[in-house]
Design a protein with these regions (language model features):
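Bacterial N-terminal signal peptides that target proteins for export
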Residues: 1-3
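Extracytoplasmic copper-binding redox domains, predominantly the cupredoxin/blue-copper superfamily
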Residues: 5-103
Length: 103
């Protein structure tokens, strides 16, 4: 789990940061499908399905792959650069979401 965070250039949390946004994996889809956060904030990927998912982003600026995420688990990812990032599941290729990161 350390590798995805290093790939994103993880930033230390600060007192002024917003609470993390949650993107759930439910019924073989992401919910919500779009979130907007600021640079340095986290998105928590939560698996609410009864089976595993593999959440990743192929974007050059924000490559991460959290590996197999078991049912009932949460994995935080900090986004360190601005941009729009497509989020996908390697196990279920039709699952897609978008994280927009602003300055």
């Amino acid at each position: 789990m350390l590798l995805p965070l290093l790939a994103l250039g993880v930033l230390a949390s600060s007192g002024g940061a917003q609470a993390p946004k949650i993107i759930a994996q439910r019924d073989i889809s992401f919910a919500p499908r779009t979130v907007t956060i600021k640079v340095g904030e986290q998105v928590i990927f939560r698996n609410d399905d009864p089976f595993g998912h593999n959440v990743y982003s192929p974007a050059q600026e924000s490559i991460f792959d959290i590996g197999l995420q078991e049912p009932g688990t949460e994995t935080p990812v900090t986004f360190a650069v601005p941009g729009e990032f497509t989020i996908q599941c390697r196990i279920h290729p039709k699952m897609r979401a978008k994280v927009t990161v602003t300055e």
